[in-house]
């Protein structure tokens, strides 16, 4: 278990204590720093919707340090990023792997970044099935459908041909921040916040 830091803010009406994530949200910063499951996706989606309703013209920054996770949960975040009016800028800190890399590439064009020592990893969806042969067949068809959908979206977001995406996601494919820029997952490597 880890401790969530609290920030004390002085105002003319006194002191106010925020958990760090609530304080960042005031500056339109969302932090994805865990594996992606339904609970995490619901939190990210609700923050995106809140910020979009609060000011539909102002960018939102999504900082990503995630090993990936559930495809359906990740697609809920992805669809919301595309659905809302504000641009969502994505910034990789540490690692953006699997669905984390998918979301990194889904940021607004020209506003996708990574810090110099961060790492990006893309691969095909993982899954397993057990049970009767027909259940295994259904699961296999679904994972192939999801793989094709994710590859198509990743090709659109990176500018890579679908054949290149299919080849490069066949196994775990790790990239430095610089390589992720060359590949089209990000637009620029940031060394200072002002560079953004």
Curated annotation (Swiss-Prot):
Keyword presence, Hydrolase: yes
Keywords for this protein: Cytoplasm, Hydrolase, Protease, Serine protease
EC number: 3.4.21.92
Catalytic activity: Hydrolysis of proteins to small peptides in the presence of ATP and magnesium. alpha-casein is the usual test substrate. In the absence of ATP, only oligopeptides shorter than five residues are hydrolyzed (such as succinyl-Leu-Tyr-|-NHMec, and Leu-Tyr-Leu-|-Tyr-Trp, in which cleavage of the -Tyr-|-Leu- and -Tyr-|-Trp bonds also occurs)
Main subcellular location of this protein, as a coarse class: cytoplasm
Gene3D superfamilies the UniProt entry points to: 2-enoyl-CoA Hydratase, Chain A, domain 1 (3.90.226.10)
Catalytic site: 98, 123
A Pfam family annotated for this UniProt entry: CLP_protease
GO annotation, biological process: protein quality control for misfolded or incompletely synthesized proteins
Family of the protein in this entry: Belongs to the peptidase S14 family.
Assembly and oligomerization: Fourteen ClpP subunits assemble into 2 heptameric rings which stack back to back to give a disk-like structure with a central cavity, resembling the structure of eukaryotic proteasomes.
Functional note: Cleaves peptides in various proteins in a process that requires ATP hydrolysis. Has a chymotrypsin-like activity. Plays a major role in the degradation of misfolded proteins.
NCBIfam families membership: clpP, PRK00277.1, PRK12553.1
Protein name: ATP-dependent Clp protease proteolytic subunit
Organism: Geobacillus thermodenitrificans (strain NG80-2)
């Amino acid at each position: 278990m880890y401790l969530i830091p609290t920030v004390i803010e002085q105002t003319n009406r006194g002191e106010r204590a925020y958990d760090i994530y609530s304080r960042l949200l005031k500056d339109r910063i969302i932090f994805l720093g865990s594996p992606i499951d339904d609970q995490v996706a619901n939190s990210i989606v609700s923050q995106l919707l809140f910020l979009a309703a609060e000011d539909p013209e102002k960018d939102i920054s999504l900082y990503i340090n995630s090993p990936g996770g559930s495809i359906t949960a990740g697609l809920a975040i992805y669809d919301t990023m595309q659905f809302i009016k504000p641009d969502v800028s994505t910034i990789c800190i540490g690692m953006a792997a699997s669905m984390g890399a998918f979301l990194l590439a889904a940021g607004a064009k020209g506003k996708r970044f990574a810090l110099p020592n961060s790492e990006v990893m893309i691969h095909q969806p993982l899954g397993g099935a057990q049970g009767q042969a027909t259940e295994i067949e259904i699961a296999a068809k679904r994972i192939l459908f999801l793989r094709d959908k994710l590859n198509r979206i990743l090709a659109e977001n990176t500018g890579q041909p679908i054949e290149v995406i299919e080849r490069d996601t066949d196994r775990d494919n790790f990239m430095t921040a610089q390589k992720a820029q060359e590949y089209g997952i990000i637009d620029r490597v940031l060394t200072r916040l002002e560079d953004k």
